[in-house]
Amino acid sequence: MSFSLNKIQKGIKREPRKIIIYGPPKLGKSTLSGSTKNALMIPTEDRVAHIDCDKTPVAKSYADVMGVFDVLLKEKHGYKRIILDTLDWFEPLLHEYICHEKGFKSLTDDHNKETANKKV
């Protein structure tokens, strides 16, 4: 890395922070996340009804989740924190979307591995 004085960053660089809270079930991760100010929860499982926070209907597909993000990007709102709850329930939605888009039976299909590893 070459360095010069004009590469010095002054002050605070404002960027969105990304946080993942990981732990065993029933620890209170969703409750903690939902208790933050100006938060919107995007649930991917139907286990957050007891949490007192703003939340979308349960996302049943990747398109549901992306639809929420699309609206949040286009429309004015006061949310400062977006909570995707939970990532382990979102992962199969993402896999399903990728398989549908790519015509794969599954992400672990041997043919897909060969196709994915080919250089284009």
Model regions and ranges:
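Conserved P-loop
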Residues: 2, 6-96
